[in-house]
Amino acid sequence: MQLLEERILTDGNILGENILKVDNFLTHQVDYRSMKAIGKVFAQKYAEAGITKVVTIEASGIAPAVYAAEAMDVPMIFAKKHKNITMTEGILTAEVYSFTKQVTSTVSIAGKFLSKEDKVLIIDDFLANGQAAKGLIEIIGQAGAQVVGVGIVIEKSFQDGRRLIEDMGIEVTSLARIKNFENGNLNFLEADA
């Protein structure tokens, strides 16, 4: 997605050897116009897939996921990273390791929001090692629902996340694919959409 790549080059900051900070439009402050455009691209890509739910993980995946759900006219569910006292029964859970935060969390979704009839599109802000997507795939599987695809805003293609998901037989659609960080710059691979 050309618009997204341009935005990353303009507003992204490289931290160290493998961290991209995009907090001014995606991970802290949200540029709703960009998120709306991203949501439309995912909706067009999966228009014929019969998607019934969009699922993400809190927090930075929520903005692109809600705009994708809006464009598809389906509900959006986000997995919670912290136990909530109001979630008392029928909870679906998985362990997820966060590359950025260097911590493992138990993420959860109330089972009443997913059924075996659902066709789910997972949306997330970043794909690095694939652990967030893997955890969501496990949760969706516990409900008997089908994961149709995983939509990623920014993929770090030099890490193993794509391979992990594709080895599970699930399609990955990334709107920006980073090949590497080199001398304070980043290089892109061709995006999936």
Curated annotation (Swiss-Prot):
Xanthine binds at L20, T27, K156. 5-phospho-alpha-D-ribose 1-diphosphate binds at A128, N129, G130, Q131, A132. Pathway: Purine metabolism; XMP biosynthesis via salvage pathway; XMP from xanthine: step 1/1. PANTHER family: HYPOXANTHINE/GUANINE PHOSPHORIBOSYLTRANSFERASE, XANTHINE PHOSPHORIBOSYLTRANSFERASE. InterPro entries: PRibTrfase_dom, PRTase-like, Pur/Pyrimidine_PRTase, Xanthine_PRibTrfase. One of its GO terms (biological process) is xanthine metabolic process. Belongs to the purine/pyrimidine phosphoribosyltransferase family. Xpt subfamily. Its EC number is 2.4.2.22. Homodimer. Converts the preformed base xanthine, a product of nucleic acid breakdown, to xanthosine 5'-monophosphate (XMP), so it can be reused for RNA or DNA synthesis. This is Xanthine phosphoribosyltransferase. Gene3D superfamilies: 3.40.50.2020. It comes from the Bacteria. One of its GO terms (cellular component) is cytoplasm. It is an enzyme of class 2 (transferase). GO terms for molecular function: xanthine phosphoribosyltransferase activity. Its main location: cytoplasm. It catalyses: XMP + diphosphate = xanthine + 5-phospho-alpha-D-ribose 1-diphosphate. Keywords: Cytoplasm, Glycosyltransferase, Purine salvage, Transferase. It is found in: Cytoplasm.
